[in-house]
Each structure stands twice: as structure tokens, then as C-alpha cells.
Amino acid sequence: MTKDKEPIVKSFHFVCLMIIIVGTRIQFSDGNEFAVDKSKRGLIHVPKDLPLKTKVLDMSQNYIAELQVSDMSFLSELTVLRLSHNRIQLLDLSVFKFNQDLEYLDLSHNQLQKISCHPIVSFRHLDLSFNDFKALPICKEFGNLSQLNFLGLSAMKLQKLDLLPIAHLHLSYILLDLRNYYIKENETESLQILNAKTLHLVFHPTSLFAIQVNISVNTLGCLQLTNIKLNDDNCQVFIKFLSELTRGSTLLNFTLNHIETTWKCLVRVFQFLWPKPVEYLNIYNLTIIESIREEDFTYSKTTLKALTIEHITNQVFLFSQTALYTVFSEMNIMMLTISDTPFIHMLCPHAPSTFKFLNFTQNVFTDSIFEKCSTLVKLETLILQKNGLKDLFKVGLMTKDMPSLEILDVSWNSLESGRHKENCTWVESIVVLNLSSNMLTDSVFRCLPPRIKVLDLHSNKIKSVPKQVVKLEALQELNVAFNSLTDLPGCGSFSSLSVLIIDHNSVSHPSADFFQSCQKMRSIKAGDNPFQCTCELREFVKNIDQVSSEVLEGWPDSYKCDYPESYRGSPLKDFHMSELSCNITLLIVTIGATMLVLAVTVTSLCIYLDLPWYLRMVCQWTQTRRRARNIPLEELQRNLQFHAFISYSEHDSAWVKSELVPYLEKEDIQICLHERNFVPGKSIVENIINCIEKSYKSIFVLSPNFVQSEWCHYELYFAHHNLFHEGSNNLILILLEPIPQNSIPNKYHKLKALMTQRTYLQWPKEKSKRGLFWANIRAAFNMKLTLVTENNDVKS
């Protein structure tokens, strides 16, 4: 957000300080400089183990009492040395003869009484202030310090030519400590400080001002006096002291710091300075004593542009409010700052005022401030931070008669909105409004200046931007950080919005169309929000990827997931969710298509692998298993009617009937054949199962013809799953003709498994080998078996 205009008084004061800093602070371009901090270590002498490459050495606030050449000689690259707040009494500058690069030396706040001179050429900053020198410690060698910017001195007495050795130097800052200055009654001393841009005089903090010294300075731009204690009796002494210092036409900035005075004397000081060339008057830490009465003040033509008073302590409890406030309200200057004071009010000027800038930060002003005040016609900036304002409606009314007001800062108050049903009234000239750190809610958007360009609402109680708000078409910058907003405000009511600050809110699902509605956005700060990394956030993250990193401040470090737990702490840039998981329609279509493809695939596989056939086999096998469980084993054996069931292809029937059956029946082996033992009227499958159940063994005549016969395979399937004697060897395989493995269809995997796992008898082509073949057949039936005939007759 655009910063509020600062008072010119502060700006000029800042310039003066910058002159000091630039002139005295040593900055190095070498990134490898070596800085050593030995402050507050209780040292009584300089350590000997300091690194040789040390450039910056801080040994302030110790107990060092003396310096020797050996303490510094090995630090040839030393540039900055801080020795303030020690106990050094004697300074011999020759201890620095090996430190040719030394530019910054601070020996303030020691016990120095004497200085021994030695040629030195490199100092830019030399501070000998707040010591016990009787006279100003000036060496003639100081005249060679052509680059000297800052010089701090102490003295108990002054002589006019004390500073003659440095008269030709152009110093940026001279600090003169006169706390221990010996005051001679009825005698005025003189001191000529020829060339200095800033002069800072420090007096005794508790003694009444009584110094009678004529100090004249050429080219003086800034004057600062510290520790001034005045009453009505010595007020004229102080004004006389000022008359010499303010004689030159170059003095623009005058500062009084830590001043205790009566109200009468303060008004006299104001009156003295009013016609002077001073443009910026600053008073810090002002204490008003004794009484406050109405004083005459002539507001003559003045060059004073700005008066700044910060931190007032009023020790007068009963006084005329009008007497106090009138002096300030009627001043004919452009800028007035009175901050951190117990002021409860400020009067409206009687006549049209010249004020362009008013800053009343940290006072006790209420909603009645400047009520119906029509004389602040030139006022452009009004700052009322940290006061007692409570009603935003009344603040708006206050501005109604300020036609030039552009910047209004009422932050850090207790402002509330929505108390009044009437529409808020604002002067239309306001373009910058700071309402931060108040108690404002959503209703504040119905009580805003119509032409506002910069609006600061951070740290309030705003939860949303209402849709029905006055269109702020000129609004360019909006700060709503540290509120409770749950979404990014669109630009429907803010068509010119280009800067949005909305960090530290409760934004979890920002609108995906935000960037589309805010085409002019050049900076957005929306980090540190509890983003919920769900489907709703996908489009927003996608849109962020299309935005320049210069537009999105803090990206990606400040943008992290808060929910779900698995994503907590993860950067938004790493958050990705597929389109399928977030699009319900697409998900349903995808699942439906997948199920359809799966169904088609399964159906095709079923057809290709003859799954219906397997299902029929499983059904028959299940029925067989059920019957087998319900019949005891002894009963099953009593129900056997045949020694063997023969399964063969019709193409192999000639061999079966001419070779196999005759031989087996010759050996009294009862055979079950389908053409003579299948019961008419029953299904083929039922006959097969019935025949297998009533046979002790099943003989399968294998050949390529067998493979091609589906019924043969049924018979093999049921025989393999016969549960009458689980674990028994009730299958006999006879290989009539060789069968290539690749000729067996995949659906006959049972046959493949049997041929690889079980031993089979192969019909030999040679007659000489057939005896062994028949012997193996006989061995398979070499047991006594009780058979039951169809008439239930028992036969062994």
C-alpha cells in the first residue's frame, strides 16, 4: 500500500541525519571484511589473540584503562575501532601509527583528560565527547584530516580560537559536550566554529540553563540542543544564547531534545524563532511545568514550514484548554505534528488556515475533533492514529468541510461501522484512506469515500466483501490483510484494482475466476492463508501458474496447504490432482466405459475359453460331490457294478472292441460301455456320471481322435473329479496314438495336466511288446472286488 506522506519536518531532519551517517559511517565494499565484537566482556586490556585481518573491532562497554602501541600495531588492516564506555584517561595518538587505514575511532564516554598528539591522516569519524577534558582536545595535526566528517568534543571551558587548527575543514557534524562546562558569572565566552553543517550541543541534564557563550558557525544548516532546563527567570538567557546561533541565513533545521520549560517560556521561544530563517522546528521529549496561562502570540510572517512536537509530559493538571490549544491551532505554518501527548482536543482555527499537513498521532482525541470545522480548507493530509475515535460515520462527517483533503489516516483507533442507517458522508477529494487496526466489519464497504484510490483495512474484523457495495471504480490498492476473509474479493466493484494485499486471512478456496475478473492486477499478496488443497483449488493453482512471479508476492514460499493432513505444509506449486478425480461427470463416464470394456472383454474371454462348458462341468461336479458326501464309503463300494468304464472316441472303437474289451472280459473284468450300459431316457452327462460312479476304474483311450471329441473330454473331466476315493489311482490312461501337445486346445487343460503328471500305457505297434502292455493292464485290476449286479446280486 502507498505510504502516507511524512511531514517535511521529519524529512528535513532525516536529511540532516543522513548527512551525519554518510559522513561518519564506514562502509566496505569488500565482502570478506572481518568484524570482531568484544563489547560487554569485562575486559581490562586489549586482547592479544585478535585476528590479524580484523577490520572492525568493537570493545565498547568494558574496563580498559589504557592503550599501548603493542595493543594495535599488529592490526594493520583495522578500519573501525569502538572504545566507548571504558575507563581510558590518557590518549596517545601514536598508538595508532601502525593503523594507517583507521577511519572510525569512538572514544566517547571515557575518562579522558589529556591527549598526546601525533600525525594522523585517515580519520573520517573521531568522537572524543563525554570525557573529562578541561579544554577542547584539538591537535594541530587535526588540520590534516581532510576527510574528517564527524568530530565529537568535550570541554569545561571554551576559548574563541580553540578550533582554529581545523578552521579550514568542512565538517558535516560537530558534537560538543558541555555537560561539565564551568559557568563564569557575568562573563561571556566566545567560540568560533567556522565550517560545519550540523552542530549538536549537549548540556547538563539537571542544571538550569545558564551558559553565556557566543557560538558562531558558518554554513550551519542543522542545530540540535540537548538537555535544556528553563523557567521564566532564565528564559531570556536561553533566547540570547540562541540569537547568536541563529544569526546566519543558512540555518533551516532546529531541534530541541529533552527540554523542560514553562508554558510561558516555550511560547517566548516560539515567538523568537517565528521571524527567523528556520524552516523546520523539532521538539522531542518536552516537559511543561508550573502553569499554563493564556499568552499573547503574534503570528507574523514566518519562513517556518513545519513544527514537530513528540512526547509531551504535562505536569500542570489545572489549566485553560483554550490557552494551550489556541497557540497551535492558529499557527500560520503548513505542517504541524503533535504526537504522543495527553492532548484531548484541538481547536478549529478561527480563520481559514494555512495547514496542509496535520499529524496528531497517539493523543486522546475523540469523535468530536474538528466537528463542523470549515477553516481547514487547504488541509491535504490528516493523521489521527492511536486516538479515541469510535464512529466511522462521524469521521466521514468531519471531512465534509475539508475540500482539499487527500490523505486520511485514522488507524489504531476503535472505529466501528454500521451504527447509522444514513449513508456516510465524505469529502470527495480523499484518495488515500487508512482504516487499519480498528473494529470494522463487512459494513465498512458501505461507508467509504467514492473516489478513493488507496484503502488500508488490514487488522479489522472483516469476513467478506458484500456484493451490494458502492462501486469504487477509482480504487487501485486494497489492503485487507489480517482479517477473516474466506475468499478473494473480485473486481466487480473495483474495476481499477491493481494491488491487493490479503495475506493472513481465512482464504481456503479462492475463486478460480479471480484473475479473469481482475485484469489490471499487477501485485497480489495472498500468502499465509489456510488453503485447502482439494479439487476446488485446482483451477486457482492452474491460473497462478499463468501469472508472473512479479505479480504474486511471496510465491511460492508463503502459499502452503493447510488441509488435508497429508498435504499440510506442502507448497501449492507442488499440489496436483487429476482431472478424473475432480470431474464427477468424467469419472462416471470413465467408470461406465471401463465397465463396458471389461464386460466385453470378459464375455469374449468366456467365449474364447469355452467358459459355459466349464460352468456346466462345475455344476455336474458339484452335484456329484453332494451325492458323494451323503453316501458312506462302504455303501459306495457295495454299489460298484463294473471293474472299469472305458472312454474312447468313436473313431477308435474298432481297436477297443477288437483288442481291449475282449482281453479284459476274458480276464473276468466287467466293463461299462456306453452303447450297452447307458440307460435310455437319461441325459448323456447323467449316464457318464452314473457309469463312472459304478466303476472302480476309468480307462481312457487317448488319441488325436479323443482330443477332438467333446464327450470324451466330459468323461475325462468327471473321472478326474471323482470323489469316491480321493487320493486313489482310479484313472488308467492308454495312449493309442501319439498326441502333440500343441494339438490339445487350451480349454482341455485337464488333459494336458494329466499327460504331464500321470503315467500312461502306450499301445505298442510291435506285437512282441504287447505282452508287457497286457501284463500292466492285468496288474491294474489285480484285487478282489465285490460287485453288485443290476438285480442287486453280489458277485466276486
UniProtKB/Swiss-Prot annotation:
<keyword id="KW-0433">Leucine-rich repeat</keyword>
<feature type="repeat" description="LRR 12">
    <location>
        <begin position="331"/>
        <end position="354"/>
    </location>
</feature>
<feature type="repeat" description="LRR 3">
    <location>
        <begin position="102"/>
        <end position="122"/>
    </location>
</feature>
<keyword id="KW-0333">Golgi apparatus</keyword>
<dbReference type="InterPro" id="IPR000157">
    <property type="entry name" value="TIR_dom"/>
</dbReference>
<feature type="signal peptide">
    <location>
        <begin position="1"/>
        <end position="31"/>
    </location>
</feature>
<dbReference type="GO" id="GO:0032717">
    <property type="term" value="P:negative regulation of interleukin-8 production"/>
</dbReference>
<dbReference type="InterPro" id="IPR017241">
    <property type="entry name" value="Toll-like_receptor"/>
</dbReference>
<dbReference type="GO" id="GO:0001774">
    <property type="term" value="P:microglial cell activation"/>
</dbReference>
<feature type="repeat" description="LRR 17">
    <location>
        <begin position="451"/>
        <end position="474"/>
    </location>
</feature>
<keyword id="KW-0395">Inflammatory response</keyword>
<feature type="transmembrane region" description="Helical">
    <location>
        <begin position="587"/>
        <end position="607"/>
    </location>
</feature>
<dbReference type="InterPro" id="IPR001611">
    <property type="entry name" value="Leu-rich_rpt"/>
</dbReference>
<keyword id="KW-1003">Cell membrane</keyword>
<feature type="glycosylation site" description="N-linked (GlcNAc...) asparagine">
    <location>
        <position position="583"/>
    </location>
</feature>
<keyword id="KW-0472">Membrane</keyword>
<dbReference type="GO" id="GO:0045429">
    <property type="term" value="P:positive regulation of nitric oxide biosynthetic process"/>
</dbReference>
<keyword id="KW-0968">Cytoplasmic vesicle</keyword>
<dbReference type="GO" id="GO:0002755">
    <property type="term" value="P:MyD88-dependent toll-like receptor signaling pathway"/>
</dbReference>
<feature type="glycosylation site" description="N-linked (GlcNAc...) asparagine">
    <location>
        <position position="359"/>
    </location>
</feature>
<protein>
    <recommendedName>
        <fullName>Toll-like receptor 6</fullName>
    </recommendedName>
</protein>
<dbReference type="GO" id="GO:0005886">
    <property type="term" value="C:plasma membrane"/>
</dbReference>
<comment type="subunit">
    <text>Homodimer (via cytoplasmic TIR domain). Heterodimer with TLR2 via their respective extracellular domains. Binds MYD88 via their respective TIR domains. Interacts with CD36, following CD36 stimulation by oxLDL or amyloid-beta 42, and forms a heterodimer with TLR4. The trimeric complex is internalized and triggers inflammatory response. LYN kinase activity facilitates TLR4:TLR6 heterodimerization and signal initiation. The heterodimer TLR2:TLR6 interacts with CD14 and CD36 in response to triacylated lipopeptides.</text>
</comment>
<feature type="repeat" description="LRR 2">
    <location>
        <begin position="78"/>
        <end position="101"/>
    </location>
</feature>
<feature type="glycosylation site" description="N-linked (GlcNAc...) asparagine">
    <location>
        <position position="144"/>
    </location>
</feature>
<dbReference type="GO" id="GO:0032720">
    <property type="term" value="P:negative regulation of tumor necrosis factor production"/>
</dbReference>
<dbReference type="GO" id="GO:0042742">
    <property type="term" value="P:defense response to bacterium"/>
</dbReference>
<feature type="repeat" description="LRR 19">
    <location>
        <begin position="497"/>
        <end position="520"/>
    </location>
</feature>
<keyword id="KW-0812">Transmembrane</keyword>
<dbReference type="GO" id="GO:0032755">
    <property type="term" value="P:positive regulation of interleukin-6 production"/>
</dbReference>
<feature type="glycosylation site" description="N-linked (GlcNAc...) asparagine">
    <location>
        <position position="186"/>
    </location>
</feature>
<dbReference type="GO" id="GO:0035663">
    <property type="term" value="F:Toll-like receptor 2 binding"/>
</dbReference>
<feature type="disulfide bond">
    <location>
        <begin position="424"/>
        <end position="447"/>
    </location>
</feature>
<dbReference type="GO" id="GO:0043123">
    <property type="term" value="P:positive regulation of canonical NF-kappaB signal transduction"/>
</dbReference>
<comment type="function">
    <text>Participates in the innate immune response to Gram-positive bacteria and fungi. Specifically recognizes diacylated and, to a lesser extent, triacylated lipopeptides. In response to diacylated lipopeptides, forms the activation cluster TLR2:TLR6:CD14:CD36, this cluster triggers signaling from the cell surface and subsequently is targeted to the Golgi in a lipid-raft dependent pathway. Acts via MYD88 and TRAF6, leading to NF-kappa-B activation, cytokine secretion and the inflammatory response.</text>
</comment>
<comment type="similarity">
    <text>Belongs to the Toll-like receptor family.</text>
</comment>
<feature type="repeat" description="LRR 16">
    <location>
        <begin position="430"/>
        <end position="450"/>
    </location>
</feature>
<feature type="repeat" description="LRR 13">
    <location>
        <begin position="355"/>
        <end position="378"/>
    </location>
</feature>
<keyword id="KW-0325">Glycoprotein</keyword>
<dbReference type="GO" id="GO:0042498">
    <property type="term" value="F:diacyl lipopeptide binding"/>
</dbReference>
<feature type="domain" description="LRRCT">
    <location>
        <begin position="521"/>
        <end position="575"/>
    </location>
</feature>
<dbReference type="GO" id="GO:0001540">
    <property type="term" value="F:amyloid-beta binding"/>
</dbReference>
